[in-house]
Amino acid sequence: MALEKAFGSKPYAFAVALLVLVGHITATELIVMPMLCVLASIAFFTCSSIKHFLPLLLTFIYLVNAKHSPGVPYWSDYYSSSYRIFIIVLFLSLLGASFIYYVAKQVIPRIKGIPPMLIPTALLSVSFLLNGIGCEGYKWASLGYGAAQIAVYFVLFYAIYYGLKGEDTDGLVSHLVYLASLIAMVLIGEMIFMLTTYDGIISADGAIVKEMVILGWGICNPIGFSIGILIPLFALGTQKDRKRGIYYYLMMMVCTLFAILTQSRNALLTAGAAFVIFAFFGCFIGNNKRLFRVMGSILSVGAIIGVIVFYDKISSLMSSLINMGFTDNGRFSLWRLALDYFKDSPVFGIGFFSFDENSYYNVAGFLPYMAHNTLMILLSSMGTVGAAAYAIYRISTLKPFFKKFTLEKLLLFAVVAYFILSSLVDNFVFYFYTAFLYTVVLAITQNIYDRQVIKK
């Protein structure tokens, strides 16, 4: 009992996040990773709740250092050479085995009756397995990638959903907001390290060079997305926690700023819009209207003064983003190509790894090249079957958020909305690590809904 309490505590979560940040900055991820895997494995064997796993799940990928990245611009073989691949496989296998033990010991016995959203989630999972099947030039890597999607959208979702059964849902939401602050600490810390140490990331005229915004695990778009999607959770924290409300409001501001500094236009639009929406409606709705009004007034005046005084520096710093304007950056040609592939293979698509001759090229080295739009990816890679299954699944996920509606669940849904809207021009729905937070939010919200039904 004492051990489980320790693993589920805020100090433990903070220690995990701090180790991830230190491991990334010092390029000692292969020292930190085994430590975290061993701790998580011990927790899986000794804890009844999966709460302990959330900080590791939501920060683990951020260990990857740009210098050692298997993706652009270094194409390093650091992780796959010598003894390092053995260390990675050994400790990830330990983590995987302990997770399977936990599912068998704690999750499966808790399944009573039909799990929520089972049929839609199962249909989506089957469509993942069938991606590209029967298509000429089918690549078996597509099957493996489909299985990885199932691991996130089916296995991980139900493991977290049942693993959190019995937890106080109010406490879970507060803990999730706290975890968001730790994720922000890691991401912003890594960005500060990048902006202050990468040679050439600031050009001679003071602009951030967009092509240099790389953290090993992602380039500007995934980085901006990973920071921006935290904004709804900080809006929730500002509404829910009057004592720490000002802290969470400031975190909303900081995350918006750093999301924009990634030079990602997607992040500029989504994070900027999210902040404005939450800051505005918080003035009229919820439990902390006075704080929203005061901070909004101060921020508005400060922003106007700041732009007037530092206009030249701001325009220089953001010139890479400004100069891009409203060009499609190749998206339209990708979407036309996706539709052509859909015409060639309309039932099951061409598969995830058949979209491009360079389909193994990507920032993480093992992700396929995709069409940068959820619908286009579904049509080209998974066909009509995949698109229909995803539509059924997506509709089914609305129920726990909007039935027995509350402001808290609306703000949790804002995380899902951010996830979906950002993916209109990117691949975040199918970069499985960018779906981890979404999966956690969905599992917690389903538990909240279950508790509401029981109370009735």
Per-range role (PLM):
Residues 116-123, 174-186, 251-254, 288-311:
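Hydrophobic alpha-helical membrane-interfacial segments at the cytosolic entry of transmembrane helices
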Residues 319-382:
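Long extracytoplasmic/lumenal interhelical loops at the membrane interface
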Residues 189-195, 279-322, 339-343:
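A membrane-periplasm/extracellular boundary helix in multi-pass inner-membrane enzymes
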Residues 122-126, 152-155, 171-201, 216-282, ...:
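Alpha-helical transmembrane segments of multi-pass inner-membrane proteins
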Residues 2-101, 130, 419:
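N-terminal signal-anchor transmembrane segment
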Residues 14-21, 42-43, 232-234, 409-422, ...:
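Transmembrane alpha-helices of multi-pass inner-membrane enzymes
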